[in-house]
Amino acid sequence: MAGNRNNDMNVYCSFCGKSQDEVKKIIAGNGVFICNECVALSQEIIKEELAEEVLADLAEVPKPKELLEILNQYVVGQDRAKRALAVAVYNHYKRVSYTESSDDDVDLQKSNILMIGPTGSGKTFLAQTLAKSLNVPFAIADATSLTEAGYVGEDVENILLKLIQAADYNVERAERGIIYVDEIDKIAKKGENVSITRDVSGEGVQQALLKIIEGTVASVPPQGGRKHPNQEMIQINTKNILFIVGGAFDGIEDLVKQRLGEKIIGFGQTSRKIDDNASYMQEIISEDIQKFGLIPEFIGRLPVVAALELLTAEDLVRILTEPRNALVKQYQTLLSYDGVELEFDQDALLAIADKAIERKTGARGLRSIIEETMLDIMFEIPSQEDVTKVRITKAAVEGTDKPVLETA
């Protein structure tokens, strides 16, 4: 029997039977021994099983039409962007599944995504919804907090740590996750001419991001922060991580107009008529993005461009009421726990939408406006047992009157 044999002084592995002289190290446990070779083999078996589980999950990726249906349940408008995202995400995970399970000689490159759209148009929410529907780890990073190596700030590898943490430190699962990098337009080069001074927040960060976006084996500090000598690192391969980057790119429509041979408003007549800036956003090509300040190599790793439109008041009202997790439904549910019915007048919903447009916050500002309107109600209602219904009026939203209360 393998193990510690009493007839000699040698120690044997309880699993493979090799003696301590035949292996590098034997670890003693409670009545059992295991050699370094069996430890390595066990780790390899576990790693393979985890990878198989991940691939099995990816094999069930919804088709583009199914992804679009899921997005439609949560995201109002942005139909062109949703279709582009659905196709890109499906193709990405199809590529991951087939390249890991076949010996095809064709090298399928991944299609990372660039989303361009104004603040509050739904860029972050689209990325979050996709990751949730696919049941893959998801992490968000702000490009403005990143700096290139050697400068005070956050290393790009810390983005990968967020993804690893979202995967509960299951690296194999993290390697098939989605990372959304917001405010990518804020690290554009300031002008097309390269400065002789160091560009801490611009081109240098783009170059650092480029390495992990195109696919590399990165060393990530387990606790975040800067790397230190002799520090244990987590190794993660980024070749199958889907990167979605987004930004407002304020003013890029002027670059599109110039390329199309039109003069910017205020400097002359246009030679070609396009209805509005939203239409110009659909005309964006890589040349415009490069002129804005992203380097060609970085743009080349973002072949899918999805342009999001500025949300109208009607869009914002639909966002308030239609999605499965619509804000109006959430607040109605909250008050129902106190036995109170909540109703919003149609002109109250429009007033909320108008406030969000006035503040230039888009959809992300809707919750704070409702919170302002509902604060006193949510404070008083739990103590007023005779109230059965609350009606939010336009005047209540504008702050000129209180919500209407109905009692039993």
UniProtKB/Swiss-Prot annotation:
Pfam families found in the cross-reference section: AAA_2, ClpB_D2-small, zf-C4_ClpX
Domain ClpX-type ZB: 1-54
Keyword Iron part of the UniProt annotation: no
GO molecular function terms listed in the Swiss-Prot or TrEMBL record: ATP binding; ATP hydrolysis activity; ATP-dependent protein folding chaperone; protein dimerization activity; unfolded protein binding; zinc ion binding
InterPro entries according to UniProt: AAA+_ATPase (IPR003593), ATP-dep_Clp_protease_ClpX (IPR050052), ATPase_AAA_core (IPR003959), Clp_ATPase_C (IPR019489), Clp_protease_ATP-bd_su_ClpX (IPR004487), ClpX_bact (IPR046425), P-loop_NTPase (IPR027417), Znf_CppX_C4 (IPR010603)
Binding site for Zn(2+): C13, C16, C35, C38
Superkingdom of the organism of origin: Bacteria
BP GO annotations: cell division; proteolysis involved in protein catabolic process
UniProt keyword annotations, A-Z: ATP-binding, Chaperone, Metal-binding, Nucleotide-binding, Zinc
Any one annotated GO CC term: HslUV protease complex
Residues the record lists as binding ATP: P118, T119, G120, S121, G122, K123, T124, F125
UniProt key word ATP-binding: yes
Function description: ATP-dependent specificity component of the Clp protease. It directs the protease to specific substrates. Can perform chaperone functions in the absence of ClpP.
Subunit structure: Component of the ClpX-ClpP complex. Forms a hexameric ring that, in the presence of ATP, binds to fourteen ClpP subunits assembled into a disk-like structure with a central cavity, resembling the structure of eukaryotic proteasomes.
PANTHER family per record: ATP-DEPENDENT CLP PROTEASE ATP-BINDING SUBUNIT CLPX-LIKE, MITOCHONDRIAL, ATP-DEPENDENT CLP PROTEASE ATP-BINDING SUBUNIT CLPX-LIKE, MITOCHONDRIAL-RELATED
Family statement drawn from the similarity comment of this UniProt entry: Belongs to the ClpX chaperone family.
Name of the protein in question: ATP-dependent Clp protease ATP-binding subunit ClpX
